[in-house]
């Protein structure tokens, strides 16, 4: 039976000769980065761009892994994975180019972390500051159970060393692409998640990407309004037990 998804897809199509036309208001362009100014900052180790196993081998190995050991993630490896997801790789004019593509280089996706076991970091909720390659400590404490509940009670998120929580700041893309921006936002999240899956695999960690969430439970956990910014995607990361592998 047709529903709102079918309606959205149909109404957001581009058709020849009927493209939406609007003048971009540069004075109202949303900020590219979200900032937490009055929180503790944790500078991350400089990521490496040399060495590592080959891309083709990483692609061959990649699986969704749901069974994890109790081993902690190292801060160095977390830094490497964060940079791989959407770290800055170059500067052209006013644009910071990143490891993942984004429609119009507008980068609507923000990265939050639920840290359960990372050496040198206290457990808590963090935000990844991309331009500074550092972490913003939002709240200290154990939040694995709450994240698990927000992920439809999938326990692998509670057992993971880290859970990546991606949100979308929709207006960053809507400013240019109007309603079609919602297509691009989710594509952007997919690019980022695949970068994470490959980087983690290259470092010997397992990941599982999760789209089944109670949106507003996770929004409340991160103090997001669910309108201007909302959680859209998760990924667990941990050292895997080599079993229960699926696509």
Per-region residue spans from a language model:
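N-terminal accessory segments that position/regulate proteins before the catalytic core
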Residues: 1-166, 170-171, 189, 203, ...
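Short acidic/His/Gly/Ser-rich catalytic and metal-binding motifs that mark active-site loops
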Residues: 172-176
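C-terminal folded domains that constitute the principal catalytic or ligand-binding module
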Residues: 192-197, 202-206
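Short pre-catalytic strand/loop immediately N-terminal to key active-site residues, enriched for Gly-Thr
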Residues: 180-188
